[in-house]
């Protein structure tokens, strides 16, 4: 089953698209969102195969999400599902898989799913062809674009990554860096065995946690080795406690 996220600020449009997708019996709807902010949070939690994305959203437009996804290491496929036909060229400039127009047509959606499966099969065949020469290098450093240069930071020294005063900040044991990367990009770069998202705006290195303090309304604060505090939202508290077996 293909995992699908539906992003549209109109509930009726979301419901119609979900209905048609489920009729194909090839997809599982793992989430939906009506704005950019919620869509990005859903993306990080559910990791879909395909995102069906409207262009005009309540807080911005779908191209903001598409541009973020384009920078990810293994991004989901993007299918723009919109009432506007004038953005087709721009859609394919951000590597969209397909561009479908409202009102939705079931046969057209089936074609899109076939296109996705064909593309994935082609990628698998290409990987098999180069498998004999593929070399994996274990990286212990994170490359951070800082102003006009790139700084290499030891991954094990990173305490947390977060949005501080509106800027994406990487805090290490000794230094604080403000980077041009987004939280979404950094989450893809960091090893999941050591780092987890604990808040919409924070990713913590679990190896640096020394104390977990209850806060309010089922939220928490993490006390890190070098003394900083990292908030844990209700959304991520359960997953964190499960990971730490508490």
From Swiss-Prot:
It comes from Bacillus cereus (strain ATCC 14579 / DSM 31 / CCUG 7414 / JCM 2152 / NBRC 15305 / NCIMB 9373 / NCTC 2599 / NRRL B-3711). Residues 142-246 form the HTH LytTR-type domain. The keyword Transcription applies. It is found in: Cytoplasm. PROSITE patterns: HTH_LYTTR, RESPONSE_REGULATORY. One of its GO terms (biological process) is regulation of DNA-templated transcription. Keywords: Cytoplasm, DNA-binding, Phosphoprotein, Transcription, Transcription regulation, Two-component regulatory system. Residues 3-117 form the Response regulatory domain. Member of the two-component regulatory system LytS/LytT that probably regulates genes involved in cell wall metabolism. One of its GO terms (cellular component) is cytosol. InterPro entries: CheY-like_superfamily, LytR-like, LytTR_DNA-bd_dom, Sig_transdc_resp-reg_receiver. GO terms for molecular function: phosphorelay response regulator activity; transcription cis-regulatory region binding. The keyword Ion transport does not apply. Phosphorylated by LytS. This is Sensory transduction protein LytT. Pfam families: LytTR, Response_reg. Its main location: cytoplasm.
């Amino acid at each position: 089953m293909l995992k699908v996220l539906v992003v549209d600020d109109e509930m009726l449009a979301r419901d119609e698209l979900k209905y048609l997708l489920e009729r194909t019996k090839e997809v599982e709807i793992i989430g939906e969102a009506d704005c950019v902010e919620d869509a990005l949070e859903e993306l990080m939690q559910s990791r879909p195969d395909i995102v069906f994305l409207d262009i005009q959203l309540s807080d911005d437009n779908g191209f903001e999400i598409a541009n973020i996804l384009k920078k990810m290491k293994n991004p989901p496929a993007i299918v723009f599902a919109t009432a506007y036909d004038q953005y087709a060229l721009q859609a394919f400039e951000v590597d969209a898989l397909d561009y479908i127009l409202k009102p939705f047509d079931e046969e057209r959606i089936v074609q899109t799913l076939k296109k996705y499966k064909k593309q994935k099969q082609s990628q698998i065949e290409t990987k098999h062809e180069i498998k004999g020469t593929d070399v994996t290098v274990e990286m212990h450093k994170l490359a951070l674009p800082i102003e006009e240069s790139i700084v290499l930071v030891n991954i094990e020294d990173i305490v947390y990554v977060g949005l501080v005063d509106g800027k994406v900040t990487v805090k290490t044991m000794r230094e604080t860096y403000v980077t041009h990367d987004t939280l979404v990009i950094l989450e893809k770069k960091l090893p999941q065995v050591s780092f987890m998202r604990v808040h919409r705006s924070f990713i913590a290195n679990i190896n640096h946690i020394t104390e977990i303090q209850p806060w309010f309304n089922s939220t928490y604060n993490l006390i890190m080795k070098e003394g900083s505090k990292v908030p844990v939202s209700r959304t991520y508290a359960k997953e964190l406690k499960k990971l730490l077996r508490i």
